[in-house]
């Protein structure tokens, strides 16, 4: 008697999975993140011979007013923010494929925190008719975003000399030292002067210098 054996193969769909990436960093400083991808079955891993790309197949993506994303062959995404951008840029989508060619995506979302430089005002006291000096000090708001030493300090209006009728004249040196040369008969507190500097992002910061003259 013949025996018939029926064999039916069931092929289960394999769906790869992914984990999104995030990062946080200071204004003006590049950040990196690496979304991760897993094969949906041990026998069908992610295809390491196919380099990851962004969703449209590119490896670079610029977002006007926000910054630029690039992706490395190992899947690390770098976001280089515009100097003045703060907040969350549009996230970027990374695409990979498994050994079956099945696509899987994940996002990378950086957060850029505002960096605000700080300053300390300067004062001085001295006798009538004698020039005085003071040096307001400035500090970057983050160790990665220092004061820009390639940009010389100026007064608030961009000048390096300021005369005040009946009081005297302020000048500022490249190192930020302010000198006030008083009119011979001036006594008391002249109008203070405001000094301006910028950090590496171009963010301005100001401080004042206030001399005092005793009779």
Label each region the model flagged.
Residues 83-88, 184-189:
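Surface-exposed, short loops/turns at beta-strand junctions within beta-sandwich domains
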Residues 3, 29-76, 80, 130-177, ...:
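Surface-exposed or secretory-pathway low-complexity segments enriched in glycine-proline
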Residues 23-25, 71, 124-126, 172, ...:
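Hydrophobic beta-strand core residues of beta-sandwich domains
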Residues 76, 89-93, 177, 190-194:
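Short, conserved beta-strand segments of beta-strand-rich sandwich/propeller modules, principally
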